[in-house]
A protein has these predicted regions:
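N-terminal leader/targeting and assembly helices and adjacent pre-domain segments
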Residues: 1-176
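Acidic, glycine-rich two-metal-ion catalytic cores of nucleic acid-processing enzymes
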Residues: 164, 175-215
């Protein structure tokens, strides 16, 4: 790996660190909102002495319904964050390839073709159901996990505050699993897109007569 290639790789690593920090902010906000919402609902005096299982189930549903907006914001936030990162990964890979060429004495630059970006980000995606839908699966998992944790908490006699803390901050928190999966998707797709962008650039350079040596 030559100096130019190392610089390009470092730029991509910096972008990866940035998206991980942004995802952490998105998830921390969601966890805090979740914890606060459960604690607010638990403070309602008309729901202090729930005895009936039916009422408990209704309360669980009320909790989950109240968290719908928070989960929607989480879905939208992580999708936007990762989508922006993947587009930047394409730019890094494409521009980086020509930067590498210039470092070897070939002063060639070809503008990025938007249809190639769309193809790399969507058509050639390795995700089975698309980025938005794939991330939505984790949000759906979060919703089911929150409901299950509320059921376990009621059965074991936990307080609502204890349940809120387990859901938001426990080592096995559903938020942690979804967060880790979002990072995995960003990393694997970002790497694939960067490589595909470099190949697109190489094909374009070859058409212009550049002698490309396979890296």
């Amino acid at each position: 790996m030559n100096k130019a290639q190392k610089e390009v790789q470092q730029a991509q690593l910096d972008e990866e660190k940035k998206v991980i920090r942004l995802l952490e902010v998105v998830y921390e906000r969601a966890k805090k909102d979740c914890e606060q919402k459960i604690m607010e609902l638990s403070a309602r005096t008309d729901l202090e002495n729930l005895q009936s299982i039916v009422y408990q189930k209704e309360y669980q549903q009320m909790m989950v319904d109240q968290l719908e907006a928070m989960l929607y914001d989480l879905h939208e936030g992580q999708f936007t964050t990762i989508a922006d990162y993947l587009e930047q990964s394409y730019i890094n890979g494409y521009v980086g390839m020509f930067y590498d060429l210039q470092s070897t004495g070939i002063p060639l630059v070809i503008p990025i073709q938007q249809d190639q970006v769309v193809k790399a980000l969507k058509t050639n995606s390795k995700l089975s159901s698309g980025l938005y839908t794939k991330l939505g699966e984790d949000v759906g998992y979060l919703k089911r996990s929150i409901r299950a944790e509320l059921s376990r908490g009621i059965a074991s006699g936990s307080t609502w505050n204890e349940m809120a803390l387990r859901i938001a901050k426990g080592m096995n928190s559903p938020f942690r699993k979804a967060y880790n999966n979002a990072i995995r998707i960003a990393r694997t797709e970002g790497h694939r897109i960067q490589n595909e962008a470099a190949l697109d650039g190489q094909h374009g350079a070859k058409k212009k007569g550049a002698d490309i040596v396979k890296q």
